Amino acid sequence: MAIASEVQIKVADEVWVATALLHREHPTRSDFEIEEIMQRATKEVAKRQLRPGVYVHVVQHCVANRPPNPGRYRMLFETAPGRRRLFRAGDSYDPAREGAKTIPAREDIPANYWNLVDWYREWNRDNVGDRIKNDPLLALRGSGKHIWADEHADDYIRRLREGWE
């Protein structure tokens, strides 16, 4: 399913398509190495050569939680150094990328990829539980409950403050 030549696809949209295809093909994977995204993009362009800007878009221009330089898309999210996934609503991002494009418009990509836009909307909506599970602050919820397991919180504070005068 090579990217059709009748639509001059933007490099950022090409990166999004390649990453979305990886997510759809590997639903149990949460993210991908930069090189995996590059290989998938190369596979999609088939007979023509991959444009030189694709790499810098995967590394920087499309990455929501990196400072814009100069591209300010929010199409990818850096989960760890060298790893990316598609950006999701609720992900943190650099404030300078506020309001930036997160998903290609249908008319900007070949018709054979339009189903990816629908797939993404469903994928983005369904995974609220994973986002909560992976949030570092929310992960702390309940982490200290064993401290007060056999003592009321007010009694614990009172005991700590004994002899402060």
Locate predicted features.
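Alpha-helix C-capping/helix-to-loop hinge sites
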Residues: 21-26, 44, 143-147
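Short linear interaction segments
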Residues: 131-165
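Flexible coil/turn residues that form the inter-helical turn or adjacent wing/linker of helix-turn-helix
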Residues: 30
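Charge-rich, solvent-exposed alpha-helical interaction surfaces
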Residues: 40, 119, 156-159
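DNA-recognition alpha helix
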Residues: 18-22, 33-46
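Phospho-regulated, low-complexity intrinsically disordered regions of nuclear gene-regulatory
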Residues: 2-22, 52-139
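Short alpha-helix boundary/capping elements
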Residues: 41-50, 62-67, 165
